[in-house]
């Protein structure tokens, strides 16, 4: 069970639900993968709709790793993500919102 107030999101990979969370380490890895200069640049890509499928993949991988998953981006390329590309993009957007919004 995920805790939205802790920034957690569920992503189901190959039928198995995983807890995702953008930890500081996961964010740093994601910045490097996405070639972002800063967290603001990274968030701006999603806010303006100028993100690629690579960006979504990097965000989902970072969230999965932050939640304790030990897989790789290569593993995720071959996996079935519940909801497909749309489900992955929604999970990525939700991860960003929950990571950078104060709990209400």
Q: What is each PLM-predicted segment?
A:
Residues 1-12, 17, 36-54, 65-104:
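Charged interaction scaffolds used for protein-protein
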Residues 20-22:
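Short capping micro-motif at the N-terminus of alpha-helices
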Residues 24-41:
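Short, surface-exposed, low-complexity cationic segments
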Residues 60:
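A residue-level signal for conserved active-site and pocket-lining positions in enzyme catalytic cores
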């Amino acid at each position: 069970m995920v805790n939205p107030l802790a920034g957690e999101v569920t992503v189901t990979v190959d039928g198995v639900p995983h807890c995702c969370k953008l930890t500081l380490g996961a964010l740093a890895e994601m910045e490097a993968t996405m070639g972002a200069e800063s967290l603001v640049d990274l968030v701006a890509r999603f806010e303006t709709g100028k993100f690629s499928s690579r960006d979504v993949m990097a965000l989902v991988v970072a969230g999965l790793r932050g939640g304790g998953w030990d897989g790789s981006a290569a593993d995720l390329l071959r996996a079935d993500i519940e909801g497909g590309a749309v489900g992955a993009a929604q999970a990525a957007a939700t991860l960003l919102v929950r990571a950078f919004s104060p709990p209400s």
